[in-house]
């Protein structure tokens, strides 16, 4: 880890965090026949298991909101190939969607307005066996439609050599595949499977169907679909806005780990450390807590090719994003290395004024534009001579997760109206004032309630003091 040219032993990252400390600890552990310590963050395990079992059983989707959006948009159903949408509807993330994000979809989700129909999952027999079956409990609330890549002998698919008893993974995969095959015989190829699934779910008829990948449109057109195919992007964006109780739990879990990670990382830096060091520490701490790091801006610098050296007396804004099973935490604070300058203190106060004004206005029925206007008006009224950028956006399966208005192939922002169970980031950034000795950021995620809003996580102080 590069700690900058001016760093000496007195400025090493805090005890236990440096490379030397880690190596020394490992050497002692290897030499001493003592019991290994309880793994870090072991206490999260049971709670995470409960959450993920529920995701596998029902999927995270807010079904009530989905039915309402489809009804309002006159959609009989949605046929979806974007991996994010497949996960949202079914709870299963397409494995190839991570490793080959721009390839044609091999797995699709189908959702119908008929509440008697469970969501559908269309995928290959091999992929279901190799990936999905491990996260799908028996009796999961979905219909599975498999397809093969060519003629096959079922006996050759997973032969039992009977040399040793089948292990838990082998039994689970065999059971899940057999359950699916007992309900729907697999055709050869994805297109026949999608068409068969649409027919089985009552969607192969006149009416409007939303889709999110052009391959779906081509499949249906080739088979002479009798209805109308329309873009489903806006509908899915509207559905994702309003979180189910399970999604709110996932958001809270992600947000808490995200915040704890940056506070743990900040405690390990000192003058002479670099921006890259801080970013690496945050990524490591987020991963230790079960989150996957997404991005981090340090002192206005988001380009990971750039770097800088942290100095005594500096204040640096951090904007951090990581996710737990695709549900995102988004948090911003100011890290002060020693005593901040008067200019930085002024910006911190101004950001807090804006954030407070916006948070006090939040309730169902308020528009995004009204929140922004409240923040700007509060800053003007305060008379504090500084520049604060105020922003708000929905957070969920993406860092900015909200519908965009599609017109002539161009996506345009919508002035959204707040609804109960939205998760909203309130963001106040003072980075345009230069020559003040640093940069300032104040950002938290709010959960919209029936008559107001509450933070989805604890709200630490505006400054992380180092």
What label would you give each PLM region?
Residues 2-466:
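Active-site neighborhoods and metal-handling regions in enzymes and metal-associated proteins
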